């Protein structure tokens, strides 16, 4: 089952 994920972490 697909997992609900948030936005990808973008390094500074």
From Swiss-Prot:
One GO cellular component term noted in the UniProt record for this chain: extracellular region
Subcellular localization(s) per the UniProt record: Secreted
Chief localisation class: secreted
Keywords, ordered alphabetically: Hypotensive agent, Secreted, Toxin
A GO MF term: toxin activity
Role description: Bradykinin-potentiating peptide. Shows poor inhibition over ACE (Ki=1 mM). In vivo, potentiates bradykinin activity by increasing its edema-inducing activity in rat paw. May also potentiate the hypotensive effects of bradykinin.
UniProt keyword Signal, yes or no: no
GO biological process, alphabetically ordered: regulation of blood pressure
Annotated tissue distribution: Expressed by the venom gland.
Family: Belongs to the bradykinin-potentiating peptide family.
Annotated protein name in UniProt: Bradykinin-potentiating peptide 10 g-AP
Highest taxon of the lineage: Eukaryota
